[in-house]
């Protein structure tokens, strides 16, 4: 009798553990599908455009381009205090990921605004190292291309994710990757981390994923030392 009870307990534990693993696996697949959909997007990318007006938490930009016979504007939502750095009439560069496509003549983004600089068409190159379960390889220079002296973490993050999606299929539902991080290192030994799997986000939507860019974190290309990407399969 005791043997039968013990067997039942063991089988129940095994079944429960197996169910938990299956549930976690489905959650990871849902997360990957959502991230693949979110980042499979054409960014708002404009150079030398003008700020129409600013509010306490938004920057409204006139792109001088037309869509649906109307002038196309970009409305960037930012954290409090960010708009103190900009005024009406400033020339800026925009690189942001739209999370809302209504109305059709306004692209809504979070952050993604830097003062315009005449960098020309020269692509900046950064040293990158990919670490997969402890195995390191240097990344090719085309892993991320940026043509501005100043750029936002949003632009760098997006371009790294696109590279990893195209070359390593990190967000494919059946891919072996379970977690990953991007570390951007500056020459003063500071590191800025981005969770490439957004595991702290409760809602699997573009709005939720892109809201992290509200801080409009800006880097000067001359300050960058290198970047590291860590991908894990277990």
From Swiss-Prot:
Cellular component, GO, one term: extracellular region
Record keywords, A-Z: Signal, Toxin, Virulence
UniProt key word Signal: yes
Gene3D superfamilies tied to this protein: 2.40.50.110, 3.10.20.120
InterPro entries from the UniProt entry: Enterotoxin (IPR008992), Staph/Strept_toxin_CS (IPR006126), Staph_tox_OB (IPR006173), SuperAg_toxin_C (IPR016091), Superantigen_bac (IPR013307), Toxin_b-grasp_Staph/Strep (IPR006123)
Highest taxon in the source lineage: Bacteria
Reported function: Mitogenic for human peripheral blood lymphocytes.
Annotated family: Belongs to the staphylococcal/streptococcal toxin family.
Descriptive protein name: Exotoxin type G
């Amino acid at each position: 009798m005791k043997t039968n009870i013990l067997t039942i307990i063991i089988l129940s534990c095994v079944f429960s553990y197996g169910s938990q693993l299956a549930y976690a696996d489905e959650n990871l697949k849902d997360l990957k599908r959502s991230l693949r959909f979110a980042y499979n997007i054409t960014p708002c990318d404009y150079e030398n455009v003008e700020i129409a007006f600013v509010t306490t938490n938004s920057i409204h930009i006139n792109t001088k381009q037309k869509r649906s016979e109307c002038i196309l504007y970009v409305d960037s939502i930012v954290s409090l205090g960010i708009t103190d750095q900009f005024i009406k009439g400033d020339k800026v560069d925009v690189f942001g990921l739209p999370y809302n496509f209504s109305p059709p003549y306004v692209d809504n983004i979070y952050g993604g605004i830097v003062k315009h600089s005449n960098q020309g068409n020269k692509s900046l190159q950064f040293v990158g190292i990919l670490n997969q379960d402890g195995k390191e390889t240097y990344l090719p220079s085309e892993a991320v291309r940026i043509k501005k002296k100043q750029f936002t973490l949003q632009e760098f993050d997006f371009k790294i994710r696109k590279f990893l999606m195209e070359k390593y299929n990190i967000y494919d539902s059946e891919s072996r990757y379970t977690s990953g991080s991007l570390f951007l290192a500056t020459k003063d030994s500071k590191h800025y981390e981005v969770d490439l799997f957004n595991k702290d986000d409760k809602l699997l939507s573009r709005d939720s994923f892109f809201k992290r860019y509200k801080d409009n974190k800006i880097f000067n290309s001359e300050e960058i030392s290198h970047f590291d990407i860590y991908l894990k399969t277990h």
